[in-house]
Design a protein with these regions (language model features):
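Periplasmic-binding protein-like
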Residues: 116-126, 202-232, 239, 243
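Short, glycine-/small- and polar/acidic-enriched structural segments
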Residues: 34-194, 210-217, 360, 364-379
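Conserved C-terminal helix/tail region of periplasmic/extracytoplasmic solute-binding proteins
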Residues: 310-382
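Sec/Tat-exported extracytoplasmic proteins
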Residues: 62, 67-68, 89, 94, ...
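Secondary-structure end/capping motifs
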Residues: 233-326
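N-terminal export signals
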Residues: 2-3, 9-30
Length: 382
């Protein structure tokens, strides 16, 4: 897929009339450190998910301090998370690597400052007994997607593991039915992701999974900001402080997954009613596992692995998803990682240890979840 729109056209078309260069001019990019709340915008069109638990934990325990913050769901169009940041409607977006590369292709001057997804979050689901350890088996097969746009997620992953993507048939089966259709016998595989893996299991959809976190060489979603904010000393410091609160929330979730899950449940009761304590906690733990990544190889929460990003941009170039050479060092910034990881770990540990779980959350057996964590994964040993 090649993106030929110029920057102006990209902003006008994808904003759906909500954000355009002509209507907001220079946006709010010149706003000083805290003359308005620091706005984070979701790529999903909803905040009613477990994915953002570090924010809700940080808000609950005051880790943001005096910072004014705001979370916005944004439109369901996944590219809005980069458009809104570029145009000053938000301060930080959370794009997938594919959407970030799309923004760079269209000359949006953004920088990734925090790699939430240290390893690849995306999986491929198969009916029980049909799972593949070698995805070359998908050549000539049909992969079900919730949205046709997800082909841009699948192609780089498949290309990286040696699949001829021109031989894979994609079918837009629709959200949220694509997993159900796979279970009913349609197609041969479906795109999934960590967190959703537990969600589907909780809904009775039993699959075998090829896990990206085990076999994909790519990273997952990251936080991006305007380059001008990185270069502005006041905004730079504000971003450091903001990310430190996220790091504390991530540390809390690592120490007490059930508590982090309960905090999201209390913020959004619909999430609890949808998942329940057991599978809600497992879903959160799957996400936390992606956020932590291969910890011994990382330099703290949020650290980008340059090799993973280089591999991703090389794959998108080979597939024609990007037409220009992307300089990884210019768009991936690890300068915030050290300062953001300098926090009071004793305070976070005490908060995690003293959190009072509700009766139903206290009944969730984390050791059982851990023992069965990869039971339905075909490409994870042990």
């Amino acid at each position: 897929m090649t993106f030929g729109m110029n920057r102006r056209r990209f902003l006008q078309v994808t904003a759906g009339g909500v954000v355009t260069a002509t209507t907001i001019g220079g946006g709010l990019g010149s706003a000083r450190a805290q003359d308005r709340p620091f706005i984070w915008i979701s790529p999903r069109g909803t905040l009613e998910v477990l994915d953002d638990y570090p924010y809700w934990v940080a808000q609950r325990f005051g880790y943001f301090g005096d910072l004014q913050t705001e979370m916005q769901a944004g439109p369901s169009d996944g590219t809005a998370t980069v458009k809104f940041v570029d145009q000053g409607q938000a301060d930080m977006g959370f794009p997938s690597p594919g959407v970030f590369s799309f923004a760079l292709e269209n000359d949006l001057d953004l920088v990734s400052v925090w790699n939430m997804g240290a390893v690849d979050v995306f999986d491929f689901a198969f009916r029980p007994g049909e799972g593949m350890t070698d995805l070359k088996g998908l050549e000539g097969k049909t992969v079900l997607l919730g949205s046709a746009a997800w082909q841009a997620i699948c192609d780089p992953i498949l290309h990286a593991v040696g699949v001829d993507v021109t031989k894979v048939n994609y079918v837009e089966a629709g959200w949220p039915a694509w997993g159900t259709l796979l279970a009913r016998g349609e197609g041969d595989a479906a795109l999934s992701w960590e967190g959703l893996r537990a969600d589907w299991q909780g809904k009775g959809l039993q699959f075998d999974y090829w896990l990206g976190l085990e076999s994909s060489p790519f990273p997952a979603n990251s936080f991006v900001v305007r380059r001008s904010d990185v270069e502005d000393p006041e905004r730079h410091k504000l971003i450091e402080d903001y990310l430190r609160a996220w790091a504390m929330g991530m540390e809390f979730g690592h120490l007490n997954p059930a508590a982090a899950t309960q905090i999201v449940f209390e913020q959004f009761p619909i999430v609890k009613s949808s998942l329940g304590p057991r599978f809600g906690t497992e879903s959160m733990m799957q996400l936390a596992n992606v956020f932590r990544g291969k910890w011994e190889e990382r330099e703290g929460w949020g650290w980008h692995d340059p090799a993973r990003w280089t591999a991703f941009f090389e794959a998108t170039a080979a597939l024609g998803q990007t037409s220009k050479q992307i300089d990884v060092a210019s768009v991936i910034n690890n300068d915030f990682i050290g300062p953001a990881n300098e926090f009071d770990r004793d305070r976070v540990a005490a908060d995690a240890a003293s959190f009072e779980l509700s009766d139903d959350m206290a009944e969730v057996d984390l050791e059982v979840i851990r023992a069965q964590f990869y039971a339905n994964a075909v490409n994870v040993q042990g």
